[in-house]
Amino acid sequence: KVLSRPYLMRRGYWYVGLAHLAYKLLRTGIEVLFYPDFHLQLMSTTVLEPRDVVVCISFSGSTKQILELAELVQSEGSTVVSITNYRRSPLVKHSDILLLTCSSENPFMSGAAASVIAQIAVIDALFIGLAMHNPEHSTKFIQKTADTIKSQKV
């Protein structure tokens, strides 16, 4: 499948992981659309094309809003990549590609560092896989973005 632009969507505390993924993809020259607001995420589904890829992150995989987004994305014929902690979650039914984290949370630790770290580990593995798929392109843009932000250091 030829990738157009990845869209990144999440609910709750998962902003950290998607911001990390947006940063990593941009470093390799992949333009990313990242809408932190749920209404913007909903509206963005109306402009999806079949070659677009949407990354949805939900620890439980059962958040109503992320399920609605994934269902809308699939109805547009786009690919849904889901990152969740539960193989049997409702989100899996709306996923074309499933990436699982391995972490535990309890009611007192919602959004705990352990779950975010597990998520970032999966995101880093995804990033490395994408970068290795086209190393010349990735290396070029990693260097180009490094040169661009180098001027911001004293």
Predicted regions and their residues:
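Glycine-rich phosphate-binding loops that contact phosphosugars or nucleotide phosphates
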Residues: 2-121, 125-133
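A short, charged, Gly/Pro-tolerant segment at domain boundaries
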Residues: 136-154
